[in-house]
Amino acid sequence: MRVKLADVCERGSSNLKQADIPGKSGDYPVYGASGYIGNVDFYQQKKPYVAVVKDGAGIGRAMLLPAESSVIGTMQYLLPKSVVLPEYLFYVVKHMHLEKYFSGATIPHIYFKDYQNEEFTLDDLNKQHEVVTTLRKVESVIENRQQQLQKLDDLIKARFVEMFGDPGTNPMGWKETTIGEECFYIK
């Protein structure tokens, strides 16, 4: 069934400032637009939730965050109602491209009132579990492939150095010259 975002979650806000976090300690994590910031001795959300960057760089980016944690004021809580799994809500919001709702030239902002009417298909809870499981597997495959590509890139660089040596130190003793001295132009 098609529903609006506002039908399946409640909006929440935080008054925490990033400057207040360093030097504090505790068991409960605090997150910002770039991820984990530090721990404090309290939390603002008891259950898992979705946080959306609402101010500054990265606006519209969604994060799935754990129970007993908090976010700073540049983030906004999307607290799932009982009809939606937090993970399902995360994937839905992640693919809504909320950045299209930004306003403000110097510091961009997005407001829940602007994107609360975004529609999506809400499946029953069993189907949501299936969708989340499938998407986790797909993300895992993508992550593994990215790691493989990075390792292949490292291998190519290592092979180049093995064949030609390090261009900075020239351990092979290659003659140093210019392209103009070694090549000629054919028209």
Model-identified regions with their sequence ranges:
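Short, flexible active-site-proximal loops enriched in glycine and acidic residues
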Residues: P86, Y101-I107, D123-V131
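A composition/secondary-structure signal for short, hydrophobic, low-basic-content segments
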Residues: I72, A105, D124, E143-N144
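Non-catalytic DNA-recognition/assembly elements of restriction-modification systems
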Residues: M1-L16, D20-G32, E119-T133, N144-K187
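A specific heptad-register position in long alpha-helical coiled-coils used by two-component signaling proteins
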Residues: R136-E139
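A short beta-sheet element
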Residues: G32-K94, S103-T106, Y111-Y115
